[in-house]
Amino acid sequence: VRPDGTLAPIRGGGALGTFELHPNPKLDVYFNYGVEYAYRTDFNFTNVAGANVSVGYGSPFFNNSGCELAPTLPGGAFAASNNGACSGNTRNIQEGTVGFWHKFYSGPKGNLRWGLQYSYFVKNSWSGNNNTPTAVGVNAKAVDNMFWTSFRYYIP
């Protein structure tokens, strides 16, 4: 949203690629990579009180001071408490995946396959310094390593 209240589209882009190998009739190996990106769409203005105000998406003046803090649990509660300020506007998301499927039975009663997959996921945010020009902006980064296994039965 612009300072005058009108909507401002967020430009972005993305890509996805896949590479597959079939070294033999019983084995399929695959590699996938995907990325999405959102550009900064930020605006600054002075409000009626004379203060500088940042609006929009990905402003370098947003407060990200709490983005690198681990949430703490208050006494006896099961939900995480507020860990501070973190606008955390997403800059990009990337994921790489590698896996395989092995067909270990194929017959008149159907097909049985098993597979393994590993995925590496990264989310980066736009940096923000809480409208403090002398401060270095904080940009949060989240990383997730994932492993899956699966068994499939295909009806004939």
Language model segments and positions:
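Residues on the lipid-exposed face of transmembrane beta-strands in outer-membrane beta-barrel proteins
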Residues: 15-21, 98-102, 116-118, 149-153
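Transmembrane beta-strands of outer-membrane beta-barrel proteins
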Residues: 29-31, 96, 112-116, 147-149
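Residues that define the transmembrane beta-barrel architecture of outer-membrane proteins
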Residues: 9-15, 92-96, 141-147
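Short loop/turn motifs that connect adjacent beta-strands in outer-membrane beta-barrel proteins
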Residues: 26, 105-114, 156
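C-terminal beta-signal and adjacent terminal beta-strands/loops
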Residues: 108-109, 115-134
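Loop/turn-rich, solvent-exposed surfaces of beta-rich toroidal or solenoidal domains
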Residues: 14-46, 96
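Solvent-exposed loop segments that connect transmembrane elements
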Residues: 1-7, 40-90, 125-141
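Transmembrane beta-strands of outer-membrane beta-barrel pores
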Residues: 33-39, 104, 118-124, 153-155
